[in-house]
Amino acid sequence: MDTNTVTKGAGNATASNSSSSLGVAVSPPMERNNSQSSIHKPSHIAAHRQSFAENQRHPPPSPRNHRHPSLTQQALLELMNHPPTNRHPNPRYAGRDWRDITVGELAVPEDVRWADLDLSVQDATMLLLKQNPTNVVLVRETPSSQEVVTTFDYSDLNAYLLVVVGLANPDEENVTLYNDISRKAQAQEDIPLREIQSLSRKEELVAVSADDYLDRAMEAFGSGIHRILITSQAGEVIGVLSQLRLVEFFWNEAVNFPAIERLYGSLLRDLQIGTQQIIAINLDRPLTDALLLMHNEGLTSVAVVDQGLNVVGNISSVDVRLLTNAASLPLLKSSCMNFISVILSERGMEHGRDSFPVFHVNPYSTLGHTVAKLVATKSHRMWVVESASPSPSAPATPLLQPSQPAGAPFAPTTGVDGPTPSGNVVMPPSPANAPAPPSPLPNQTFTTTVIPSGLPGARLSGRLTGVVSMTDILNLFAKSSGLRPSDPSEQRARRRRSSSSSVRPSLDSARASIDFRSKSAAYGWQYTSNYEYN
């Protein structure tokens, strides 16, 4: 059979050539028969139009009415980020009252990290960074001693950093010490832990026996203690129990403890826990302002907000780990928002995926939802937000000047832990034509600036109105179980640095000419860290 003839007659070059090449007989093309078309059938058209009109008058029910409602994208993300906990009782704790569980059952001896007072700050920092789930190094007098004399954590590292780069302005009695530490750091001399003990206020050391019951730890944590030491009968430290570890325990094992599990279904609004006295910082303030704020107020984290007071991120003392490389020192002069982007980028590299941890809840969130986020983010607190406020689109320049000059002493104002430096945090006024903000809060203070357009802000969270910490949650657990924890404000006051000590609010003030690269020798920490974000 002639291929060209078949192709020409078929009118379909592709199909005919393919079939002819295989030696398959090709039938002649089918002619379109006009009688088969409805184009010449007016009656059919009329019937079709009538049927169409009837369908419009009485449309059939939508199949969507019979479909199960789908999860919203936000609900799906929440489910992925916080999967349901195991609903099967743990044989180890089933049928037991949590107050009958001993502290030693939660001890993990492998998590204890030791250093002696003569160890250098650099070496102690490496112990703190590398695979340390407790985020603390226990310090003893000598390598052979088993008695804990102090601790070294990220708050201490933050205090040391501020002294080294010349941002802390000490009291008169500490001027010589601060100058000596700065001089040794620039000369790349080892600085032992013994010499930096007075740089930050220490939390009270609380030790409990491994044979003590969990209610004693609960009472301590509900009183504001962040961690306790677990000791053996011989007095040796065999573990460190933190607030996070205990909250995580009750979250994972809640099915075994009905009294605790019932609380998880309650709304934060109904439980009335947390505080509405908030300390926050604006997103375009220098990172050093956030570090100084945490140091002077004894905080482990601070909310970063835009001009509409919408939460755009969170900076914690643990994030200081990203500043222990000499190459990262220029970040100190960058904005808080820029540092948040560095934190997110670092998380993405560590976990192999993009991540945006959520550090906020709302008054209608359940306690269980809040605890799930605390456990997932390993954070000490969740910011409570309401519906997002519009964020103005304007250059990132302050609308207001600080209430006092940068070099003037700070006047005390009321904050979460007592007096706060009003030169560093002020409440921006609302525009005259703006609606009244929901739930106006007394003593609520913030820094001032305008969020640049395009940066994440209002659409990510909402207006900051309060905060719920692990101390608040464990205090609730303790009181609901008949315990009597003391007032957490006593521990908060202890962690605060003396308000009489002044600090420089910005690198753009008296020390704007600091050469950070000349300070980088103070660290000498040129290594790549692989450790769990907390």
UniProtKB/Swiss-Prot annotation:
It is found in: Cytoplasm; Nucleus. GO terms for cellular component: cytoplasm; nucleus. It comes from the Eukaryota. One of its GO terms (biological process) is cellular response to glucose starvation. One of its GO terms (molecular function) is protein serine/threonine phosphatase inhibitor activity. Keywords: CBS domain, Cytoplasm, Nucleus, Repeat. Residues 107-172, 199-259, 274-331, 335-391 form the CBS domain. Residues 1-45, 388-447, 481-509 are annotated as: Disordered. Residues 9-27, 388-403, 499-509 have a biased composition (Low complexity). The keyword Cytoplasm applies. It holds the Pfam family CBS. Residues 428-441 have a biased composition (Pro residues). InterPro entries: AMPK_gamma/SDS23_families (IPR050511), CBS_dom (IPR000644), CBS_dom_sf (IPR046342), Ssd23 (IPR016711). Involved in DNA replication and cell separation. Belongs to the SDS23 family. PANTHER family: AMP-ACTIVATED PROTEIN KINASE, GAMMA REGULATORY SUBUNIT, CBS DOMAIN-CONTAINING PROTEIN. This is Protein SDS23. It comes from Chaetomium globosum (strain ATCC 6205 / CBS 148.51 / DSM 1962 / NBRC 6347 / NRRL 1970).
